[in-house]
Structure formats: structure tokens, C-alpha cells
A protein has these predicted regions:
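Conserved acid/base catalytic micro-environments in cytosolic active-site loops
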Residues: 1-146
Length: 146
């Protein structure tokens, strides 16, 4: 799976989202290929919830759905949102809402993007705090999370 391949090149643990999986420090969670990724609070924990609801902007999973869902369980000011290479504009409108609510936003630059669609859409609507090459994004995320 994609998560298994990422585990061979990334230091943090990479898991594909599953119902009830806890979101925690040091863990990278990627959306399942056929379900929206949403979240629920379980006491002090935040857990993944998979949804097979209708596609949003023709996408399932949808970045817009995921970004909107996280603010229901975590204050926007405590989040760092990142948009990497991708086709289309999925996630841009939700990233703008996050940005307007105080979330720090990071976007992959055009030079290092295979497809500039999704990150370019975020830049075009003025929702990017940082536009960086792929190899600089992890360090920026760690700095912003402090």
C-alpha cells in the first residue's frame, strides 16, 4: 500500500486511516482511497472516522471534507495545514477557511510539484502562509508546530 511505501522513506509512522485510529504526535495518517476522512473527539483523544458519503467536488476522499472535519475537534489556531502536489482544486476552499480562522498554512511550490493544481489553487485565493519546495515542508511543519 501507499502507507507501507511511505514507511520505508519517512521516519514517522505512516498509517492508512481506519475507524477509531487515534491521531497522535509522531504519526502520519493518510486517507483511505475510497472514503472521506473525518474525526471525532473521544475524551482527550481524536480518532479517525471513515465515511462513504457522497463525493465532494467529485472526490472521495476529499481534502475539503477532511480540513473542515478537523476544526470540529481541534481549534484552528492549533493546526498546521499542508497542501501538496495534486490535480484540481480540492481542499482550496477549506484551506482558505482554515487560514481565515488562524491555521498556519503551507503549500508545495510549483517547481517541486508534479501537478500545481491543488497547491496553485490555494496560492491563487491567498490562503498560503508559506510556499516551499517539498524538501523544506517537513522542517517548516515542525517549526510551526512548536
Amino acid at each position: 500500500s501507499f502507507a507501507q511505501r511511505l514507511n520505508t522513506i519517512l521516519e514517522p509512522e505512516v498509517l492508512e486511516a481506519s475507524n477509531g485510529l487515534e491521531v497522535c504526535a509522531g504519526r502520519v495518517i493518510i486517507a483511505h482511497g475510497s472514503h472521506h476522512l473525518t474525526f471525532r473527539r473521544d475524551g482527550t483523544a481524536i480518532r479517525c472516522i471513515l465515511s462513504d458519503s457522497a463525493p465532494v467536488n467529485r472526490h472521495r476522499p476529499s481534502v475539503d471534507v477532511m480540513f473542515d472535519a478537523i476544526t470540529a475537534v481541534k481549534p484552528a489556531q492549533e493546526l498546521v495545514a499542508v497542501m501538496l502536489t495534486g490535480m484540481g482544486c480540492d481542499g482550496a476552499s477549506a484551506m482558505k477557511r482554515l487560514h481565515q480562522s488562524g491555521t498556519r498554512t503551507v503549500v508545495q511550490d510549483e517547481t517541486s510539484s508534479v501537478v500545481w493544481g491543488m497547491p496553485g489553487a490555494v496560492v491563487d485565493i491567498g490562503a498560503a502562509d508559506h510556499v516551499l519546495p517539498l524538501d523544506k515542508i517537513a522542517t517548516c511543519m515542525l517549526d510551526l508546530a512548536k
